[in-house]
Amino acid sequence: MGQWDEKEPREVEVVKGACLILRREALKQVGLLDESYFIYSEEVDLCYRLHQAGWRVYWVPQAVVMHYGGQSTRQTAGEMFIRLYQGKLFYFRKHYGRGTFRAYKLLLLFASLARLCMSPLAWLERPPERQRHLTLASYYSRLIRSLPKL
């Protein structure tokens, strides 16, 4: 895969974010955003369904939208972290079946445990970085505890 011009529109698998412009015909064919997602990954799901129906998805760098981050969630960073992975797990269960869902969940567990095992190394960092690593460790700990419920 070669370089691409970031100033030119480009066909992509997924566009993520707060603004999507879609053809009415496409929405009629594939449906709206799936409300089963609490938040996060619903746009990935929509793009997947668009591709499955034969539509193409483009990223257009000239399109600019002002997004005031977090205005729709009002969650703590830890809650948002858990919700992000909830959305990903729901996506895998919905589109790839139980086996892939379980494999992703197991991979997520091992990756989270690895991150948690590395968290003591945070004490070797300067205080601001140390705090960031310790905060992330607390998020991964919460994620591990929530995995059986997901």
Task: Enumerate the language-model features and the residues they cover.
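Active-site-adjacent helix/loop segment of glycosyltransferases
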Residues: 48-131
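Membrane-interface aromatic/basic loop that binds lipid-linked glycans or pyrophosphate carriers
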Residues: 130-150
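A structural signal for well-ordered alpha-helical scaffolds and beta->alpha junctions
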Residues: 5-8, 15, 81, 85, ...
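A C-terminal cap/extension of S-adenosyl-L-methionine-dependent methyltransferases
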Residues: 1-2, 6, 10, 27, ...
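A short, conserved alpha-helix in the catalytic core of glycosyltransferases
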Residues: 4-8, 13-64
